[in-house]
Amino acid sequence: MARTATIVRETSESKVELSLNLDGTGKTDIDTSVPFYNHMMTALGKHSLIDLKIKATGDTDIDAHHTVEDIAIVFGEALKQALGDKRGIRRFADATVPLDEALAKAVVDISGRPYCVCTGEPEGFEYCMIGGHFTGSLVRHVMESIAMHAGICLHLHVISGRDPHHIAEVEFKALARALRFAIEPDPRVDGIPSTKGAL
């Protein structure tokens, strides 16, 4: 069964068209209307090996927040849809990823219970403007939106970092690598990886 999803979400603030394939090679085609977010979502697809296509427009003349949030919501929904009943996946994974002076660790449980803990971002990071359109505060908001709508438990910890671009990027890459292993089929698991029999 193909682990794919396509979702279109349109509101008065944005229109998001997104498709993904969990069993891809990291091929991406990203146009979020927010240049730095293009970079982040491209990295997320590349390093998770999820084929990811996004076309989004929104009221970025007001602020990038609505469009960025809505893309994260749709990505989470698509991830949940593509995972189906989660039969045969590894479920748990973690990844620690460096980028020069920045280092972050992501731990993921594809549990069906949404939870997100983000820690370690340096004081003032949330106020940094990255790439002219993307504030540091949006990183946590993206992570929370993905976790809530995908139904996953995510712990993300920034261990070190100075450059706001590097800090944001390493958070996305750590999530990507953790997802890459958590969603991967485990050849030793035949059913649903839970003592409850459902996730």
From Swiss-Prot:
Compartments in which it is found: Cytoplasm
A Pfam family reported for this protein in Swiss-Prot or TrEMBL: IGPD
Cited SUPFAM superfamilies: Ribosomal protein S5 domain 2-like
Molecular function via GO: imidazoleglycerol-phosphate dehydratase activity
Statement: the UniProt record of this protein carries the keyword Amino-acid biosynthesis: yes
GO CC terms of this entry: cytoplasm
This protein's pathway: Amino-acid biosynthesis; L-histidine biosynthesis; L-histidine from 5-phospho-alpha-D-ribose 1-diphosphate: step 6/9
GO biological process, one term: L-histidine biosynthetic process
EC number(s) per entry: 4.2.1.19
Reactions catalysed according to its record: D-erythro-1-(imidazol-4-yl)glycerol 3-phosphate = 3-(imidazol-4-yl)-2-oxopropyl phosphate + H2O
Name of protein: Imidazoleglycerol-phosphate dehydratase
Native organism: Bifidobacterium adolescentis (strain ATCC 15703 / DSM 20083 / NCTC 11814 / E194a)
Gene: hisB
